[in-house]
């Protein structure tokens, strides 16, 4: 099997979708998980104001609202978590996303103090963090906060990982990649936009340039600049289209060297890392 087809199969991407059917699929998936694990009462998700968390948040709130109505269990909640590092540059987008999602509960945890404390502790141990590694600290601190909230509310942490991120490994290991359940898995970036359009989301929340915004030295660095390919390229690749060889090799290069991010910790029985 050609590597492109192997990747498409592994990530479950369809060449085209019915947006409303995929919305229903994700909502039912979340509801089914909570019904099967009835001791769980909350879905917890960090909201940044970007496309992915806005979509996942809306799906979570709809799943919880439906399940609450169906079961009469008023303890079921969706908790949206604001996780700024100091002052968020696109604060208004985050507020707009919250207004669109209309979550049951909103918590704000400013991670700056925790990140700086960790950095200082490492400095005292003789390690000075690079800006890139500090960026990963931010992502992991955000996930740590979400798991603390989930632990105190009988919750599960929801992820925003989708196929266009997964294929490039464009997430922090045990940061935004360390979640319990991922309702967007199988969708590429343009398909996520289709779902948001069908849900009536304000366009500026999904037409803005995606950015992880983790590095202080390169604030709001667009994902596409970091990756060296566009999301249009990645989406075309995941839909099975033929791309320029250089672009295809770039995407496949990211996929191969980030394989460890998509797997559990490596054991003596694994050999994927040898290829």
Swiss-Prot record:
The keyword Lyase does not apply. Keywords: ATP-binding, Ligase, Magnesium, Metal-binding, NAD, Nucleotide-binding. InterPro entries: NAD/GMP_synthase, NAD_synthase, NH(3)-dep_NAD(+)_synth, Rossmann-like_a/b/a_fold. Transmembrane segments: none annotated. Deamido-NAD(+) binds at residues 140, 173, 180, 260-261. GO terms for molecular function: ATP binding; glutaminase activity; metal ion binding; NAD+ synthase (glutamine-hydrolyzing) activity; NAD+ synthase activity. Mg(2+) binds at residues 52, 165. It is an enzyme of class 6 (ligase). It comes from the Bacteria. Pathway: Cofactor biosynthesis; NAD(+) biosynthesis; NAD(+) from deamido-NAD(+) (ammonia route): step 1/1. Its EC number is 6.3.1.5. It holds the Pfam family NAD_synthase. One of its GO terms (biological process) is NAD biosynthetic process. One of its GO terms (cellular component) is cytoplasm. It catalyses: deamido-NAD(+) + NH4(+) + ATP = AMP + diphosphate + NAD(+) + H(+). ATP binds at residues 46-53, 160, 189, 211. NCBIfam families: nadE, PRK00768.1. Catalyzes the ATP-dependent amidation of deamido-NAD to form NAD. Uses ammonia as a nitrogen source. Belongs to the NAD synthetase family. Homodimer. This is NH(3)-dependent NAD(+) synthetase. It comes from Enterobacter sp. (strain 638).
């Amino acid at each position: 099997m050609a590597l492109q087809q192997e990747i498409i199969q592994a990530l479950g991407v369809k060449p085209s979708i019915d947006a409303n059917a995929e919305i229903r699929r994700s909502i039912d998936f979340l509801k089914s998980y909570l019904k099967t694990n009835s001791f769980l009462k909350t879905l917890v998700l960090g909201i940044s104001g970007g496309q992915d968390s806005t979509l996942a948040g809306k799906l979570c709130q709809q799943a919880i609202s439906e399940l609450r109505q169906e079961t009469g269990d008023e303890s079921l909640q969706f908790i949206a978590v604001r996780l700024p590092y100091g002052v968020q540059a696109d604060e208004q987008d985050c507020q707009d996303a919250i207004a669109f999602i209309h979550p049951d509960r909103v918590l704000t945890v400013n991670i700056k103090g925790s990140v700086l404390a960790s950095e200082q502790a490492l400095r005292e141990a003789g390690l000075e963090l690079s800006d890139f590694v500090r960026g990963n600290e931010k992502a992991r601190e955000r996930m740590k906060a979400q798991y603390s909230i989930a632990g105190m509310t009988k919750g599960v942490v929801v992820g925003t990982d989708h196929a266009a991120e997964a294929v490039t490994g464009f997430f922090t290991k045990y940061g935004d990649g360390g979640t319990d359940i991922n309702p967007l898995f199988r969708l590429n970036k343009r398909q996520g936009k289709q779902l948001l359009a069908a849900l009536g989301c304000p366009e500026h929340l999904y037409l803005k340039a995606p950015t992880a915004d983790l590095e202080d030295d390169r604030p709001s660095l667009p994902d596409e600049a970091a990756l060296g390919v566009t999301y249009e390229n990645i989406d075309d690749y995941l839909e099975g289209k033929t791309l320029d060889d250089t672009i295809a090799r770039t995407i496949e290069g990211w996929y191969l060297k980030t394989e460890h991010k998509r797997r559990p910790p490596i054991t003596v029985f694994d050999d994927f890392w040898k290829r």
